[in-house]
UniProtKB/Swiss-Prot annotation:
PANTHER family (UniProt xref): AN1-TYPE ZINC FINGER PROTEIN (PTHR10634), ZINC FINGER A20 AND AN1 DOMAIN-CONTAINING STRESS-ASSOCIATED PROTEIN 3 (PTHR10634:SF98)
UniProt keywords, alphabetically: Metal-binding, Repeat, Stress response, Zinc, Zinc-finger
Name the UniProt record assigns to this protein: Zinc finger A20 and AN1 domain-containing stress-associated protein 12
Signal sequence, start to end: none
SMART domains given in the database record: ZnF_A20, ZnF_AN1
Keyword Repeat annotated: yes
Annotated Zn(2+) 1 binding sites: C21, C25, C37, C40
Induction: By cold, dehydration and salt stress.
Zinc finger (AN1-type): 159-205
Length: 224
């Protein structure tokens, strides 16, 4: 339709340089389509015989031959072990598998066996020193004697504890009161004002208060 409209427009315009289709269909042709219109040129291409696919067949034949040759080479390389163990051998190992070839080298080559023997010998000769077990030191007889002497002295000191009042010499026994000045007194003379006490209670209290309430002083501010 577009070509017919173009032809009508050309005819109405008084003619042009475009030539008619060589098949005489009434449409215009061009040099690019061998003086045919687009429809006739497309039909001509469809009617033309296709070229035989010779090249793909040749490529397929070459690939098949190459795969056959590779398979044959692989079959030659994967020959069975000459020792008859059932595994595959190779030309590099005298047509033997790796295990049979290694056993063959061990049996025939003294260097191979001697190179492996020092390694085993060195591993077997290594000895690990074991540290002797440490035992806990037992207390000596001298220590026991010292402990017994200390216990005896403490019991003697307890037995020698005075059981009489220092002021009136009254026997107090275990009910005596010990003053901080070091003496033992009865219930009558147990207070500091009832006997000549030499202990400074005020000083002791001041030291105790100072110890329990330390003076906290903030550090001085350094001016720059």
């Amino acid at each position: 339709m577009e070509e017919q409209q173009a032809a009508a427009a050309g005819g109405g315009g008084g003619g042009g340089g475009a030539s008619m289709c060589a098949n005489g269909c009434g449409f215009f042709g061009s040099e690019a389509t061998k003086k045919l219109c687009s429809k006739c040129y497309r039909d001509q291409l469809k009617a033309a015989p296709s070229s035989p696919p010779a090249a793909p067949d040749l490529v397929a034949n070459e690939e098949e031959e190459a795969s056959t040759a590779a398979a044959a080479a692989a079959d030659e390389q994967l020959a069975l072990c000459s020792s008859g163990c059932g595994f595959f051998g190779s030309k590099e190992t005298n047509n033997m598998c790796s295990k049979c070839y290694r056993d063959h080298l061990k049996a025939t080559s003294p260097l191979f066996s001697s190179s492996s023997s020092p390694a085993t010998a060195s591993t077997t000769d290594i000895t690990v020193p074991i540290a002797p077990a440490t035992t806990a030191p037992t207390p000596s007889l001298k220590g026991k004697e010292e402990e017994a002497t200390a216990a005896a002295s403490s019991s003697a000191a307890a037995a020698a504890k005075p059981n009489r009042c220092v002021a009136c010499r009254k026997k107090v026994g275990l009910l005596g009161f010990e003053c901080r000045c070091g003496g033992t007194f009865c219930s009558t003379h147990r207070h500091a004002d009832k006997h000549a006490c030499t202990f400074d209670f005020k000083k002791s209290d001041r030291e105790k208060i100072a110890k329990e309430n330390p003076l906290i002083v903030a550090p001085k501010i350094t001016k720059f």
